[in-house]
Amino acid sequence: TFYLGEFFGWNFAYQMIGIIVIFLCFIFLILIKEPTREIRPPKDFFKEPLGWFEDSFLAPLKDLYLRYKNHLLLLLLLIFTYRLSDMFLGPMAMPFYRETGFTKIEVAEITNFYGLIMTILGGLFAGASVYRFGLSKNLVAGAILTPLTNLPFIYLNMIGHDVNFLILTITLDNFTQGFVNVMGVTILGTIVSKSFTATQFAFLVALVSVPPRIVSGGSGIIVDNMGFHEFFIICALLGIPAIIFSIMAHKRRQELGFE
């Protein structure tokens, strides 16, 4: 996108990206076959509205509650806060790069292309680490790494335009993002029941999407009133609740199935 924006303008860049995404989605829809599975006929909404509502919504939530009971609040708080620090920083990353003096080409090459590679490597490392050390320890590690890897942005803001330090910052931040993304998906995959996978997964993903909706609007306000230095400090501090909840989950890993 940044390469196209640099040479052809943003209007052309976004049009081309939209066309490419639609084309790829169309190809995948054609090529990927749905898995064969036994489908239980759902209750008719018009004939049995209460039964339909119970099967579609109440039963999955009831199952989630009955399986975790006293630990459900901890799980929801962990899901809600686990990536809060990165979600708060995300909307202001691009304005920060531009204000610091990085060109579109530098942003494209370092934060997008190289950053994507580091995100993939972080995800692969997370999968191997979960296999070797288990889920709960890696949850704690991811919660600690997230605010720590936000701190280099503070120094980058102090020194200004420095390509080498931007590469180091993106290396640490995107690798951790890939690691934490896998942890987040693993949490959801561990919590959901096979009988209600779709509904429970949709509910939990919706819960995960709440933090960015709440906090992203405040990012720009804080930057305007306090500056990027204080903003990045706040981003790091927002990672503290996730550390606390992940440690609590680690202590209850047997009950939660996070071993």
Where are these predicted regions, by residue range?
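Short amphipathic helix-loop junctions that connect adjacent transmembrane helices
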Residues: 91-108
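Helix-to-loop junctions at the C-terminal end of transmembrane segments
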Residues: 5, 121-138, 223-224
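Intracellular juxtamembrane helix-capping segments at the cytosolic ends
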Residues: 178-193
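Juxtamembrane intracellular "pre-TM" segments in multi-pass secondary transporters
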Residues: 36-74
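Helix-loop-helix hairpin linking two adjacent transmembrane segments in secondary transporters
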Residues: 1-32
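C-terminal ends and interior cores of transmembrane alpha-helices
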Residues: 144-161
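C-terminal membrane-cytosol helix-exit motif in multi-pass small-molecule transporters
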Residues: 20-41, 245-250
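A late C-terminal transmembrane helix in Major Facilitator Superfamily
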Residues: 195-225
